UniProtKB/Swiss-Prot annotation:
Function: Lethal neurotoxin. Selectively blocks tetrodotoxin-sensitive voltage-gated sodium channels (Nav). Does not affect tetrodotoxin-resistant voltage-gated sodium channels or calcium channels.
Protein name, as recorded: Mu-theraphotoxin-Hhn2e
Known partners and oligomeric status: Monomer.
Tissue: Expressed by the venom gland.
Presence of keyword Cell inner membrane: no
Propeptide residues, chain positions: 22-48
Amino acid sequence: MKASMFLALAGLVLLFVVGYASESEEKEFPRELLSKIFAVDDFKGEERGCKGFGDSCTPGKNECCPNYACSGKHKWCKVYLGK
């Protein structure tokens, strides 16, 4: 009887310790996630020298990135197929 009570109490203590540790990690997780999001957001501030797929462009000015061409009809960068 004493051994089963001791094991039950030890199990509860272990459960408390594991729960506290995981809760502590969960509190740090949002901070880490936000810091990673803002670190990625810093790269968006840098401008490219060319325009990507779907960006508006002026035909004949070569504003689109390599492998893209400015569509004269739609006036946006599209994939250049070599035709």
